[in-house]
């Protein structure tokens, strides 16, 4: 296995740090740094649900995603200036919401909505995966707070969830692509998994050559190893924030 342009082994994540409680005014929050990618994730609770869910005794979790104008090399116009979110933004925020909902016990959540907001401060590849991984920590901290305030009888989580990118670069399967790798990859994939190894979503796109089944299996194995490490980072951040 050859080293990558930044010296990492093919199965190595970028340095990943999650700082819990980054936004004091949020019910739960975290700043996640994955290499040079940085995303602020917040969770806010509202004591109501969408109209179509009212009276069912179930809660809801939804997500929004955005990038600061200077988060990339070229200034990105704000969605509010454009008048609507672009297609990529809509796709990513739906992915974040689906991913987090995969580990929620909606009955235990009760008739309340948790809003997850993921704002990219700096983008160097993997922003959607970093958003999912950080949003889970923000959510877990928000639920701990609600339980501590007596608003929840128990934590309505069925497990943890994290996400990581992987792909084929120069014919080699690699984990956690940064921007230079992502922009030149023959195959680009995003994998969302629970801490127990259950797949929530797999997105894989072959850019120039078809993806073989052998390479797909290799990518999933890489992702599983990466997500196992990310789960440890998540658990450490939650433990730090909830320690007496």
Kindly give the residue locations of the regions a language model identified:
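Short, conserved phosphate-binding/catalytic loop or strand-edge motifs used
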Residues: 110-118
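Glycine-rich, flexible beta-strand/loop modules in the N-terminal catalytic cores of phosphate-handling
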Residues: 22, 30-109, 199-221
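A structural signal for small-residue-enriched, beta-sheet-centric alpha/beta enzyme cores
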Residues: 87, 108-111, 126-130, 140-144, ...
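A short glycine/serine-rich beta->alpha loop
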Residues: 81-85, 118-127
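Glycine-rich, charged/polar anion/phosphate-binding loops
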Residues: 16-19, 25-28, 46-49, 101-103, ...
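Short amphipathic alpha-helical face segments that pack within enzyme cores
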Residues: 95, 130-138
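Alpha-helix C-terminal capping segments
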Residues: 33-35, 137-141
């Amino acid at each position: 296995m050859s080293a990558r342009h930044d010296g990492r082994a093919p199965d190595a994540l970028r340095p990943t740090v999650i700082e819990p409680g980054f936004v004091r005014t949020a019910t739960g929050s975290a700043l996640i740094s994955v290499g040079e990618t940085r995303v602020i994730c917040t969770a806010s609770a509202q004591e109501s649900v969408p109209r179509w869910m009212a009276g069912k005794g179930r809660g809801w979790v939804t997500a929004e995603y955005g990038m600061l104008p200077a988060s990339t090399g070229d200034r990105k116009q704000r969605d509010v200036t454009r008048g609507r979110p672009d297609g990529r933004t809509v796709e990513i925020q739906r992915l974040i919401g689906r991913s987090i909902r995969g580990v929620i016990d909606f009955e235990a959540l009760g008739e309340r909505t948790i809003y997850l907001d993921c704002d990219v401060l700096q983008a160097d590849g993997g922003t959607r995966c970093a958003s999912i991984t950080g949003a889970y920590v923000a959510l877990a901290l928000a639920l701990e707070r609600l339980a501590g305030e007596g608003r929840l009888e128990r934590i309505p989580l069925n497990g943890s969830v994290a996400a990581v990118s992987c792909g084929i670069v120069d014919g080699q399967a690699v984990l956690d692509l940064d921007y230079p790798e992502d922009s030149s990859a023959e195959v680009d994939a995003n994998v969302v998994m629970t801490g127990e190894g259950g797949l929530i979503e797999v997105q894989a796109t072959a850019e120039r050559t078809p993806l073989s089944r052998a390479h797909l299996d290799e990518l999933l194995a890489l992702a599983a190893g990466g997500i196992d490490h990310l789960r440890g980072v998540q658990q450490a951040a939650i433990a730090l924030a909830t320690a007496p």
